[in-house]
Amino acid sequence: MSRRTSSRGSSRREAMVGNVPIRSLPKVSLHDHLDGGLRASTVFELAQELDVPLPADNPRALGEWFAESASKGTLEEYLDTFHLTLAVMQTADNLTRIAREFVEDLANDGVIYGEVRWAPELHTDGGLTMAEAVQAVQDGIEEGEDAADEAGHAIRVSQILTAMRQANRSLEVAKLAVDFREDGVVGFDLAGPEQGFPVSRHAEALSYLAGEFFPVSLHAGEAEGPESIRDALITGRALRIGHGVRIAEDLETIETEDDEVRVRFGDLARWVRDREIPLELSPSSNLQTGATAAWGASLEDHPFDLLYQLGFCVTVNTDNRLMSRTTLTRELSQLVETFEYDLDDLEQFQLNAAAATFLPVELREELIDLITEGFNR
């Protein structure tokens, strides 16, 4: 795709593409964790109420602590920061509040549809059952949708229930997801440490979901390479790949005699590209966790643009807004600055995401129409 001149957005001023504020554009968020999307001020307030020790003495400093602690270069160290957010997410009231604020923050960022993923099994220390936790989150989502609507911003948010790869409750979580399929839950996920905990450990749960025709998006290709993605597709029947950035390891760059550069596809990469299997790329998070270390340490080294130019179905996501101190607007702005994308490129990313949602086809088509209309304006 040809590149056109784009104004370079600034994190200190309104991020722009051309003369259009990126925040004003309709967006779709596919990969956004509830326990990574809290406001630092909310964590600070709730932790004080619960006497949870804090590493900072004010909300701003706490936000800086999350970002710095999550930027150590490995997924394991990135995940260590979640002990603090999880500590304040063990009651129905807190879960409802956090989910409501989560939706409000998405709406303020121009998101018109989002899928929030989280692991109910990590929210039972205060005595909640997993089903009670799911209902508390759903209550908060609906409150957030109503508040956004009153403020003039229509938004819909669905839940994706996550099971932890290192635990043994995936079948229980899978059945819970199916039980709530008419009450806000649209998908299932596996998250947590990727190395040493393959998708195949959860074959029973994933077979159950396949039998129920229930959509699956699995974390893969983040801390491990192409074999993890292969496992997600074959064992997990995944319809989307959470991150999936390391699919680029199945591509080989070849210089020809006339100094042209060509790319040779491995079988897996060609399958993912040709079948248009969506990749839930999260640029800032990928840099923090070291998922892109094989290519470099800056955004310009991220294989996002390579995958996009080669025709992969790329989508742009935040992963964990608190840990990455980011928003979808900021992620898109950084891509515009780095790769000189224009309005057409940003629209394509949103259309990819809209088509990849776990909504019924009629609602996906409505979402695509809303995006097209919004970008045309």
Question: Positions of the model-derived regions?
Answer:
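Metal-cofactor-binding active-site regions of metalloenzymes
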Residues: 2-4, 12-214, 222-240, 246-377
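Short HxH-centered metal-ligating active-site micro-motif
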Residues: 219
